[in-house]
Amino acid sequence: MKPMVLTLLLAIAMLQLAMAEPTYRVFVSNEEDNSLSVIDSRSNKVETTVAVGERPRGIGFSPDRAHVYVALGDEDAIAVVDSRTLQLVKKLPSGSDPEAFAVHPNGHIYLSNEDANKASVLDPASGKVLAEIPVGIEPEGVGITPDGKLAMVTSESTHMVHIIAIPEHKVTANVLVGARPREVAFSADGRWAYVTSEIGGQVSKLDIATSKIVQTAQLDVPNAKPKGVVVSLDQRTLYVSTGGANAVAVVDADTLTQKATIAVGKRVWGLALSRDGSRLYTCNGLDNTVSVIDTATNQVIATIPVGKRPWGVIIDD
């Protein structure tokens, strides 16, 4: 190989490696500020605020983490923000009232259209909606199984989880859960799904292979209205936000027994766990703050002011 060609290939490889480096930024959607707060996770300080559009709620990364996607409920669009330059790149048509979404490893965005009672599949590369899938009333949470073969959508008023085959985009099962299901998370091995039910005050455990609920537990937190749920790195623990109960419930993933309660800010909503599992970030919607929790001690180690009514949070680390 000629030296010039080798040098060029090495330069390209180094550039790709540099682009893969994390930014160590935490991104927070602020529902009533129409903005995205960008936090430096190393200093726990807000780096900047990005105007994104009307009523930002659901938030996620592209598979390469080069872009942040934000659902704009009052614009019927998905905002695309460059995760490094922090510039608003474009807006993609999403269908009516997008609330939450999940990004498939192939790059497609699976989203809930809350007031249209459907889920949509959006290709960010072309900007086209590839499929529209009827589901229950007021679809909310969306998750994709670790193997990428299923999407799950919760419907708040139908009290169900709708299981959708990928790439067929057909509903294969409708699973009744607790009242007003909000969010779904998965074990890393793809065996279990965990579903929060806001009005029911419950967490349910769903066997993905059989599409059956195997266990449901009430949270041991007064006035708990569970919303967000994430699974710990070792798969042994669930962290569940409790809405107006102003706490995070720490739950055994095997037995659904509650192990601890962590007091945070008012109306705790979206959650995100750092890649190494050592830090949990919570959106406190009525305090306009984000709490940072040390998961080794279950203690809040920082409280960060952000925009008005923080809804969702993700971290690039």
Question: Model regions: which residues?
Answer:
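Predominantly soluble domains enriched in secretory-pathway, periplasmic, or organellar proteins
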Residues: 10-11, 16-317
